Amino acid sequence: MGSILSRRIAGVEDIDIQANSAYRYPPKSGNYFASHFFMGGEKFDTPHPEGYLFGENMDLNFLGSRPVQFPYVTPAPHEPVKTLRSLVNIRKDSLRLVRYKDDADSPTEDGDKPRVLYSLEFTFDADARVAITIYCQASEEFLNGRAVYSPKSPSLQSETVHYKRGVSQQFSLPSFKIDFSEWKDDELNFDLDRGVFPVVIQAVVDEGDVVEVTGHAHVLLAAFEKHMDGSFSVKPLKQKQIVDRVSYLLQEIYGIENKNNQETKPSDDENSDNSNECVVCLSDLRDTLILPCRHLCLCTSCADTLRYQANNCPICRLPFRALLQIRAVRKKPGALSPVSFSPVLAQSLEHDEHSCPFKKSKPHPASLASKKPKRETNSDSVPPGYEPISLLEALNGLRAVSPAIPSAPLYEEITYSGISDGLSQASCPLAAIDHILDSSRQKGRPQSKAPDSTLRSPSSPIHEEDEEKLSEDVDAPPPLGGAELALRESSSPESFITEEVDESSSPQQGTRAASIENVLQDSSPEHCGRGPPADIYLPALGPDSCSVGIDE
């Protein structure tokens, strides 16, 4: 295989290769892969030669069974990798079957069983003019670098529909209907032995004699499923991109969704994992892909730590064989077009020795099973006038810095409306309780110290013995609480101000204190009548605080 890639000839040798050849997995004899692989211009050895680096080994059967000539010159070491341009893309999530009920309910001419007719619809994007054709029960063959599909019968091939360039274009062809009443159950799925695909959607770039895009195509392979109620649905299998007569198998990257898509509704669960941060440190943006599970979940720093300390993916816990960093580049903002500063972007630029731009740059994977090359600074690979950014930022834009959430005020900082302005913040809660007690004693009401109407502090609860003693001394004048002792025995100026306010309060302040007492009385069990009363708790006032009863 290495000799085939090293040759530079105009064509490819016409080798007679059977269907079950060495280019089918598993092969009859020998190995499918060699003992090393090249990525980013570097060579990596692996002790698992039969391990597909970008997915499952069975995915290799979706590729062609014949070797092809690699059309590009092997890049020199430390030379940026050339990226491929995708001119056509079929959104596989939009692929669906549309049933025609009028024709499905009508019996056939023979009167055997009713016809079950469906048609295919999907959405696609095109940066060039394309020609789309649908094939059913078709086999694949590559001729001169182009994929040619041959259906089982001519009636299983649709007419070719031409489209102009555009985004989010809808494909619908009611004239081509699929009659599942004529299909067998084994024809609904992909047959590996025969190499027959249930349905193939081929979109070929149709730009005339433009050499740059000649032979460029996008292929969607799908299968059908039959449900218990007799209905059918379509299931995408794989997508392939054919560029310069080479077929590339497209693989999904998990965690790279475009959040700007209006069709995708945001999740109501705030705890869902829909952020762009690394799943390990929860601070830096994700820019490292784990292979072969293809989870984009790590930042640069955590990836360097993981490759030396563990060999399992933090998401699926499967062992990984390589780490691939993917980043993008953008034009630097000019003097007249300032761009808001992003601290996350600044952190990414500070770790430039680990960066690996996606375009015009060289990715540096790390393999635990192979050598661990030292990463070099690749700032020279960034084109002039561009700067590297995260791939997630390129898709979803720069992340806006959320404003700082103000912290909740401390207990001492809460202001009370019934206290004079001369009191300090630390003495406000004590003065408020003292004011309520003094105003209640001035009215001369009987005081009840029942346990149900007692205001307790979590740091100093009242024991049962104290509760019984308080219930016996109902008619006796109440002793001074801890709050009153703390205020009246103090010699500070604030304590004198507190006593003056309590003893000679103005009518307005007395009314305000009475309103507070009325609120407390309305919430008592006698006024509410809601069954067993509930205890009221306040945060601890301090290490020397004690519980204070509320007058009824």
Swiss-Prot record:
> Which residues are modified to Phosphotyrosine?
411
Q: What is a single Pfam family found in this protein's UniProt entry?
A: zf-C3HC4_3
Q: Is Zinc among the key words of this record? A: yes
Q: What's the stated role of this polypeptide? A: E3 ubiquitin-protein ligase. Mediates monoubiquitination at multiple sites of TSG101 in the presence of UBE2D1, but not of UBE2G1, nor UBE2H. Plays a role in the regulation of endosome-to-lysosome trafficking. Impairs MC1R- and MC4R-signaling by competing with GNAS-binding to MCRs and inhibiting agonist-induced cAMP production. Does not inhibit ADRB2-signaling. Does not promote MC1R ubiquitination. Acts also as a negative regulator of hedgehog signaling.
Motif Required for TSG101-binding extends across: 406-409
Ranges of Acidic residues composition bias in the record: 464-475
Name by which UniProt lists this protein: E3 ubiquitin-protein ligase MGRN1
Q: Which GO terms describe its biological process?
A: endosome to lysosome transport; heart development; negative regulation of adenylate cyclase-activating G protein-coupled receptor signaling pathway; negative regulation of G protein-coupled receptor signaling pathway; negative regulation of smoothened signaling pathway; protein monoubiquitination; protein polyubiquitination; protein ubiquitination
Q: How is it modified after translation?
A: Autoubiquitinated in vitro.
The Swiss-Prot or TrEMBL note on domains reads: The RING finger is required for ubiquitin ligase activity.
Xref: SUPFAM superfamilies: RING/U-box
Quote the CDD domains the UniProt record gives: mRING-HC-C3HC5_MGRN1
Q: Keyword Ribosomal protein, does the record have it?
A: no
GO MF term (any one): ubiquitin protein ligase activity
Q: Which species does this protein come from?
A: Homo sapiens
**Region (Disordered), start-end ranges:** 355-384, 439-552
- Describe, by residue range, where the zinc fingers (RING-type) fall in the chain: 278-317
Taxonomy, top ranks, is: Eukaryota, Metazoa, Chordata, Craniata, Vertebrata
Residue numbers with lipid attached (N-myristoyl glycine): 2
Q: Where in the cell is it found?
A: Early endosome
